[in-house]
Every structure is written in C-alpha cells, then in structure tokens.
Amino acid sequence: MIVYEDEALVVLNKPAGLSSEGDLPARLRELWGAPDAYVGVIHRLDTGVSGLMVYAKTPAAAAELSRQVTQSQQAYAVLDGRAEPDGMAAPSPVFVKRYRAVIAGVPDEDLPAAGVLRDLLFKDSRKGRVFPVRRPRKGVREAVLEYRIAALSADQTRSLAEITLHTGRTHQIRVQFASRKHPLLGDGKYGSRVKGSIALQSCGLAFRHPVSGERMEFALDLPAELPWSAFSD
C-alpha cells in the first residue's frame, strides 16, 4: 500500500473500498504503531476508487501541500479561461492529478477521441448523487477535465481514457463521462450495467516536496485484472 514515505509525507496506493478520510489514516496509524500520529488529508478519492494519494505527516507539510493544491486550482482556472491572470503570465499547475478509466463505448459525437469536458454540477447531498445542470444556481460548481482515449477494447465496446483533472468536484469524472452516455464500468450509481468495482484509478501524482522543494512524480502501471487487462497489449 505504501509507495513512498519520509519524515514529511507518505504516498499510498489506495485500495478500492477504503475511505480516504477515515479508513486510510487509521490504517497508517496502525502500521506506524502510533494511534495519535498526525495524518493530514490533502486530497480525496471516492471510496470505490483506487490509486495514488499523498498524506502529510506534519502540520507544516500539510499546509504546504494544501497551498500547492490551491495554486494549481487557480492556475487551471486561468488556463481554462475561468479566471483572469493576476497581472502575470499564467503559472503552471504544481499539484497535478492524473487518472485512467475504462468507459463504456467508443468515441462518438458526444465524446470525441480527445478534448476538454466542461459542465456545471450540482451535488444533492440528500440523494448522495451529483447531477449536471444547465444554469448556475446555489450549490452549482463548474467542473473541467482534460482527457484522451488511449485505447479501444478488441470488441470495440469499451475505451481506456486518460484524464487530467482541472477541478476536483465530487464524483466529477464519473458524472462527466456518464452524462455523455459513456459511464465508467462498474459505476452502477451513474448508469453502468457492469458489476464490480468502479473502473477508475488515480494513476499519476506530481507535486513539490513540502520541505526540500524537489519535484516528485509517481505513477502506477495499468492494473492486471479485468476490465483493465483488455488494454494491456
């Protein structure tokens, strides 16, 4: 589960089925044999999603990594045209999250082979779901992601998508693809008829070390099991 660890942070390969705010910090404290150890949550993954996450081991590291997350959100907003540059050239995002997903279908008019998806999303907390809407209103937030279709299954029924998040909305990737009639496999909440875990993996993570400033990059291989194995050749 642990990919990298030092005195300031720990990078994990989160298994599907564990919550990123409750289960994983508890597992870390158990591994360390330190029930009161500090574990700073920097970003989140849905419980049913697997892949890379970084946690801070000190409040100072948490503050710096959180600052990088905020900087990256602002940088993407400028790059996407959602915000004006602050008198200078738009900075490059520092904290970068990349994903891969297996989605139903192949590229079509609703979902070209590559592009940027922009939607207004409304989170209905009572129903535990997120819905795309057409107009801004209270509780609605803009969601933006960049993607490309990297491969098609041999039977031309599924696609492997590589995704870079520009915003970090609840269920964002799942909803944006499902709203274009390409739900993620295993995501019954948003329309998939395939049973199993949600076919979404946090496969890449990059940031600056909160103490040294060194650029750190982590990547995961394509999982060996279905449905990922359909794209392993």
Q: Language-model segments: what does each one mean?
A:
Residues 127-131, 142, 183-190:
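Short Pro/Gly-enriched beta-strand edge/turn motifs at strand-loop
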Residues 131-137, 192-194:
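Short, P/G- and charge-enriched loop/turn segments at secondary-structure junctions
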Residues 161-164:
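Short histidine-centered loop motifs in beta-beta connectors
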